[in-house]
Design a protein with these regions (language model features):
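Residue-level marker for buried hydrophobic side chains located in beta-strands
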Residues: 26-28, 50, 73, 146, ...
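Divalent metal-coordination and catalytic microenvironments
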Residues: 17, 29, 53, 65, ...
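Metallo-beta-lactamase
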Residues: 89-92, 121-188
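Residue-level marker for the onset of beta-strands and adjacent loop->beta junctions
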Residues: 13, 24, 105, 111-113, ...
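Active-site HxH/HxHxD metal-binding segment of metal-dependent hydrolases
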Residues: 32-116, 120
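Short Gly/Pro-enriched turn/cap motifs at secondary-structure boundaries
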Residues: 5-7, 104-106, 126-128
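Conserved beta-strand hairpin/beta-sheet module of binuclear metal-dependent hydrolase folds
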Residues: 1-44, 136-148
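Short, glycine/acidic-enriched loop or turn micro-motifs at the edges of active sites
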Residues: 22, 32, 56, 129, ...
Length: 188
């Protein structure tokens, strides 16, 4: 797992998951910095753009990956409206207009789906609450959970944005994330 850490005050992380055996990779939550990080994907066999949710800071670099690799970003069906509103979110947070090109999403995934990245298996865990259709990706054999904004470093994700619901997020995390093995590494 290669991390491209957060950008400025938004502090969003992008991850590149690569299966060592096959060289197949997935880009998860391509952020603002990602479009300046061409070297991070140079020579990789990128097969997926995976989004934990549709907030603008997690999708800003999706068009770069789409243009470079001809891939469509994938997110949950319940997250399509959040993704479609990314430019509006950016205006709300940054108080200015930026060009935000969003490729049409590819096939949505759902709770329990398994995405094969070479020999790695990312299981989709639906974790609504930060957004209506947010997810985490769990790779059991490596003991890694990619949490998006469902979990921050040391705390739960914020729930005060449109579509957020703290009770839902807490309940989901208790039922689905806290039941994972204790030695799981969480990558927010």
């Amino acid at each position: 797992v290669k991390a491209l850490l957060g950008c400025g005050s938004l502090d969003e992380n992008t991850y590149i998951i690569t299966d060592e055996a096959s060289g197949v990779s997935a880009v998860i939550d391509p952020n603002f910095e990602f479009i300046k990080a061409e070297d991070a994907v140079k020579g990789l066999n990128v097969k997926y753009i995976l989004l934990t949710h549709g907030h603008f800071d997690h999708v800003f670099g999706a068009d770069f990956v789409h243009t470079t690799y001809g891939l469509l970003p994938r997110l949950s069906a319940d997250e399509q409206a959040t993704y479609a509103a990314a430019a509006e979110q950016m205006r709300m947070f940054l108080h200015r207009d930026f060009p935000l090109l969003l490729p049409t999403p590819g096939a949505p995934f759902a709770e329990g789906d398994v995405i094969a990245v070479g020999t790695l298996r990312l299981r989709v865990i639906a974790t609504p609450g930060h957004t209506p259709g947010g997810v985490c990706f769990y790779e059991e054999s490596e003991g890694v959970l990619l949490s998006g904004d469902s979990l921050f470093d040391g705390e739960i994700g914020r729930c005060d944005l449109p579509g957020g619901d703290e009770d839902t997020l807490v309940s989901v995390l208790q039922r689905k994330v806290l039941t994972l093995p204790e030695d799981v590494t969480v990558l927010p």
